[in-house]
Amino acid sequence: TNDLVAAKIAALEGGTAAMLTSSGQAANFFALFNICECGSHIVSSSSIYGGTFNLISVTMAKMGIEVTFVAPDATEEELDAAFKENTRAVFGETIANPALTVLDIELFAKVAHKHGVPLIVDNTFPTPVNCRPIEWGADIVTHSTTKYMDGHGAAVGGAIVDSGNFDWMAHADKFPGLTTPDESYHGITYAEKFGKEGAFITKCTAQLMRDFGCIQSPQNAFILNLGLESLHVRMPRHIEHGQAV
């Protein structure tokens, strides 16, 4: 059940692989921690969900991961200035919760790729009905499926989608967790075994889901799937209501 729903969300976003998590916060944490470790640095938009802001700036700081926040409409020069030698990811939200500021995905992606790191975008608010961040350059997309995807306040959940576009082996020195043998999983090297299309999600499942257990229950995945069936009908109606207000 979980695999079917994850595959459906991957198809909606135009990705190559996906996984479900127990919540949107779990999805964001996994997406970042899958490529960051003690001593890593993250560049993040400052206009993001408060829970995610605290996750990155407070909780992950206790793990030895630091962050530099930038405005969602920062210039290329301002973005460049935020990077360090140990930067491993760039993060932002398509439309921020609750500020509703819009991220310049193309620019953030351009700068992230210039520095050899992926752009992770939380696409909860627009959903792939209104925006597909991968088409604008994002490498990893996350969701709190609790919101519009479920649509009925019935099931908490999250999702991570990999675009399959980021070449981990081309930046092997930055991402040893993906490009060197995993001693906890029979010495497998994810980027070699699964390629850029499947390495990120496979590692996230085999390592983080195994160790942290933030899995979405099959019953919640079943409920989420029901919500996805009407997503294409509900989102235009939400937009109509917003425009009327």
Which role does the model predict for each range below?
Residues T1-A11:
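Conserved PLP-binding active-site segment in aminotransferase class I/II-type PLP enzymes
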Residues G14:
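Portal/gating segments that form or line small-molecule/metal binding sites
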Residues A17-V245:
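Conserved PLP-enzyme active-site core in the AAT-like
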